[in-house]
């Protein structure tokens, strides 16, 4: 959740443009999509409901376009447990 917007988080999916766009179109209750890899690189996608470039900038000095952006979390630690990743990202979102 980011400022009342609902998002989907994936871990190590990679190449998210097509699956993220398809997911967001098929699930209009979701406003954004984030995939983070084991090195802390995140890709963000949206379908016009939230500015993910602004989100990426505020999260970790990232950037991009309104519907497609990215950033790198320098303090991210590789983990196996998805719940740890989810907690990490939600804590970051809560701070912006």
Residues of each region from the PLM?
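Gly/His-enriched, cation/cofactor- and phosphate-binding structural elements
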Residues: 1-96
């Amino acid at each position: 959740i980011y400022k009342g917007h609902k998002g989907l988080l994936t871990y190590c999916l990679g190449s998210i443009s097509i699956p993220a766009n398809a997911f967001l179109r098929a699930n209009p209750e979701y406003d954004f999509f984030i995939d983070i890899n084991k090195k802390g690189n995140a890709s963000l996608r949206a379908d016009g409901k939230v500015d993910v470039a602004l989100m990426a900038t505020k999260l970790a000095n990232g950037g991009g376009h309104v519907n497609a952006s990215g950033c790198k979390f320098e303090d991210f630690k590789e983990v196996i447990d998805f719940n740890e990743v989810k907690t990490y990202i939600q804590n970051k979102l809560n701070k912006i």
